[in-house]
A protein has these predicted regions:
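Carboxylate-rich, polar loop motifs that coordinate divalent cations or form catalytic acidic clusters
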Residues: 1-167
């Protein structure tokens, strides 16, 4: 009898927890798409910078959303400081005004204060990350570290493998 009471109390307790877990606040959510200015319907990545801007990488450009409108960054042959890529795969930042943008073919630096882009690395890139005051770039078999963005990267690690891509 005591086991049955315990089992009933336990089941009620667990079901109460489940009900509490399903309680949510009303969230006001507005969806944005190409009709509101997003450059492409396929979104590959998001990043929120230290100023509150939401950076959205799409297949057709880099988008900055300020909460109201989009600003789209695309290659412009007339501007040597424009972004060099359209298909944005990843965005990260250093929380000091610099963004790092990865495509399949390169990594590009964007200085928000100067409103200028410049290529940091060309060639296949598997991933990027900014951590411990350095930009980390992973290729198919190696990991590079940029401590000073004006100097060549340091080869941090290389996988001893005969395979094409490890990462």
């Amino acid at each position: 009898m005591a086991k049955a009471k315990f089992l009933v109390v336990y089941c009620l307790f667990i079901s109460g927890l489940c009900c509490m877990a399903n309680v949510t606040k009303d969230i006001n959510m507005r969806f944005k798409d190409v009709r509101q200015g997003l450059s492409h319907q396929t979104v590959n990545c998001f990043y929120q910078d230290e100023f509150g801007f939401l950076w959205i990488g799409t297949q057709d450009g880099l988008n900055r959303f300020d909460g109201r409108k989009f600003e789209v960054f695309k290659p412009d042959n007339a501007n040597p400081y424009s972004i060099n890529i359209n298909n944005i795969r990843q965005v990260c930042g250093n929380k000091a005004g610099l963004l790092f943008i990865r495509s399949l073919q390169s990594v590009t630096l964007y200085d928000m204060r100067l409103n200028r882009f410049r290529v940091l690395r060309e060639g296949e890139v598997a991933g990027i990350c900014y951590a411990h005051d350095a930009l980390w770039i992973a290729t198919g078999k190696e990991i590079y570290r940029y401590r000073n963005l004006d100097q060549a990267p340091e080869l941090f690690f290389s996988f001893p493998s005969d395979e094409e891509d490890v990462l």
